[in-house]
Structures are given as structure tokens and as C-alpha cells.
Amino acid sequence: MKLLLLLLTVTLLLAQVTPVMKCWGKSGRCRTTCKESEVYYILCKTEAKCCVDPKYVPVKPKLTDTNTSLESTSAV
């Protein structure tokens, strides 16, 4: 009976593991080091990085040449 109680206690303690902090709209995980397949762009509240799968990171917008748009505006 004591063995059963000990087993139950250990099982309950293992089930109460601290949940992983999520970030980036719940698509990322706060870790000290990211996996090889992950990238990070922001930091979590602690000194951890927000590790995200690259498919969830938005693509950087392509910048337009501002000089050409200014020249065409001044010619009008």
C-alpha cells in the first residue's frame, strides 16, 4: 500500500511540471537556446529567446526605391 501511495505521489509531482512560456502569438517557445530548425527575432520577459519555426515568421516587405518616387512626384 505504501508503494502505491509513493507511486501516486511521484506521478502527481511529475504532472505538475512548470508549463513552458509561450510567445509570438503562441507559435513560439521561450528557451535559452533555439533548436537548429528555429529562429528568434524577439526576446521573452526573462533572458530567454522566443524560438519560432521560420514558417510562422512574416516575410520582410520589399522596400521600394524612395528616390524614384520623389523624382516622379517633383516632375508633376
UniProtKB/Swiss-Prot annotation:
Disulfide bonds join C23-C50, C30-C44, C34-C51. InterPro entries: Beta-defensin (IPR050544), Beta_defensin_dom (IPR025933). Residues 1-15 form the signal peptide. Abundant expression in the male reproductive tract only. GO terms for biological process: defense response to Gram-negative bacterium; innate immune response. Keywords: Antibiotic, Antimicrobial, Defensin, Disulfide bond, Secreted, Signal. It is found in: Secreted. GO terms for cellular component: extracellular region. Belongs to the beta-defensin family. Has antibacterial activity. This is Beta-defensin 121. It comes from Homo sapiens (Human). The gene is DEFB121.
